[in-house]
Amino acid sequence: MSLGRLCRLLKPALLCGALAAPGLAGTMCASRDDWRCARSMHEFSAKDIDGHMVNLDKYRGFVCIVTNVASQUGKTEVNYTQLVDLHARYAECGLRILAFPCNQFGKQEPGSNEEIKEFAAGYNVKFDMFSKICVNGDDAHPLWKWMKIQPKGKGILGNAIKWNFTKFLIDKNGCVVKRYGPMEEPLVIEKDLPHYF
């Protein structure tokens, strides 16, 4: 039996907290089909820019900024520059940045993962880059589906991601604490960081 099918069968019990083993529900529910019953970002996994699967539980205890990125957007330079700056200044305090390339907005991230990695290296990116994904629609990555429906992850005029460089601030427990629109530059997040370190 597949993990997805098992989670669908057990969903009523999981939602009611009937399983005694803590973490079991989350481990099983962060799949492509059953992301709704996840309780934190730490229950998901994603492929890094080199194609290796990463369990996002590795970010437990860290404050994270999760953002969709694009190489050919008018906001690319300011966002990459400021994200690199934030990472350089706050990584030792426990900040982690997770960048997810996405080609859904104006086809502004057309390159391969290798090309995207090379582009990011031009900005001296030291934060974590992931493989290209969709952030909206049926094919959206489960993490992004989940973040958009969290009480503090909802957007203005609907929950869909509106453009490149939408950012989510995630606390040490893996919960969404704030969403920033694409027009908000990364340094805007700096004022909120001290509340979560």
Curated annotation (Swiss-Prot):
CDD domains: GSH_Peroxidase
A GO cellular-component term linked to this record: nuclear envelope
Catalytically driven reaction(s): a hydroperoxy polyunsaturated fatty acid + 2 glutathione = a hydroxy polyunsaturated fatty acid + glutathione disulfide + H2O; 2 glutathione + H2O2 = glutathione disulfide + 2 H2O; tert-butyl hydroperoxide + 2 glutathione = tert-butanol + glutathione disulfide + H2O; cumene hydroperoxide + 2 glutathione = 2-phenylpropan-2-ol + glutathione disulfide + H2O
Molecular function terms from GO: glutathione peroxidase activity; identical protein binding; phospholipid-hydroperoxide glutathione peroxidase activity; selenium binding
Enzyme's top EC category: oxidoreductase
UniProt-annotated catalytic positions: 73
EC identifiers of the protein: 1.11.1.12, 1.11.1.9
Entry keywords, A to Z: Cytoplasm, Developmental protein, Dwarfism, Lipid metabolism, Mitochondrion, Oxidoreductase, Peroxidase, Phosphoprotein, Selenocysteine, Transit peptide
Modified residues (Phosphoserine): 40
GO biological process: apoptotic process; arachidonate metabolic process; cerebellum development; chromatin organization; dendrite development; lipoxygenase pathway; long-chain fatty acid biosynthetic process; multicellular organism growth
PROSITE patterns assigned: GLUTATHIONE_PEROXID_1 (PS00460), GLUTATHIONE_PEROXID_2 (PS00763), GLUTATHIONE_PEROXID_3 (PS51355)
Physiological role: Essential antioxidant peroxidase that directly reduces phospholipid hydroperoxide even if they are incorporated in membranes and lipoproteins. Can also reduce cholesterol hydroperoxide and thymine hydroperoxide. Plays a key role in protecting cells from oxidative damage by preventing membrane lipid peroxidation. Required to prevent cells from ferroptosis, a non-apoptotic cell death resulting from an iron-dependent accumulation of lipid reactive oxygen species.
Subunit structure: Monomer. Has a tendency to form higher mass oligomers. Interacts with FUNDC1; this interaction promotes GPX4 recruitment into mitochondria through TOM/TIM complex where it is degraded by mitophagy.
Name of protein: Phospholipid hydroperoxide glutathione peroxidase GPX4
Species name: Homo sapiens
